[in-house]
Amino acid sequence: CGKTETAKQQAQSAVYLQDPDEGPSLVALAEVRPSVLLEGAEPHLIDEWQMAPQLWDAVRFAVDQGKGKGRFLLTGSATPKKRPKHSGVGRISRMHMRPMSLFESRESTGAVSLAGLFDGAAEVGAISDRSIEDIAFALCRGGWPEAVLESDPEIALDQAKDYVAELLDSDIDEMDDKKRNSTWLRAILRS
């Protein structure tokens, strides 16, 4: 969805917990002194915070100490294995990001809106200059920025396939440590 890239555009400093060279040391440091990872010019990005869930509570504590809003940007794509002690209510706002729409990727005029369809818009209709093959490709490719910007259609489709495969093979088990049958999940998605 471009969460990290979007946050990087706003951040003045950053910590990347998924960095293969520094990540393990940063996660270990978060165990003993999480406040160190909050240091840096603000707004300060903490990418993949869920790898060290205690950072959530450290951010909450830092926010309680004052100094204004918008000091920290926490990005992550998975549910933390260990829940933070505090919800962050009143201190931390969540922003849900979605893949790009066809309108955002300039593959649609936006004349017909999915939201409008669900809201019961009286008049729904438009003519598209896109072929049914183009629309089917865009639906299969998805709206992930890397895939949308990829000029080679095969690579763009492979990125979507790889994303779904990774989600089914590992990410979905990390949500709650329950093993799921990825073959069964793939069959559901194919149906």
Locations of regions flagged by a protein language model:
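Conserved glycine(s) of the Walker
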Residues: 2-3
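Hydrophobic positions on the alpha1 helix immediately C-terminal to the Walker A/P-loop
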Residues: 6-7
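Post-Walker A helix-loop "phosphate-sensing" segment adjacent to the P-loop in P-loop NTPases
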Residues: 11-22
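Short glycine-/polar-rich loops that comprise or flank the Walker A/P-loop
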Residues: 12, 41, 68-70, 89-93
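Conserved nucleotide-sensing/catalytic segment adjacent to the nucleotide-binding pocket
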Residues: 25-73
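Helical "lid/switch" subdomain of P-loop NTPase nucleotide-binding domains
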Residues: 48-51, 55, 78, 88, ...
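Short regulatory helix/loop adjacent to the ATP-binding pocket of P-loop NTPases
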Residues: 80-95, 106-111
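Interdomain hinge/linker elements that couple catalytic modules in large macromolecular machines
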Residues: 107-191
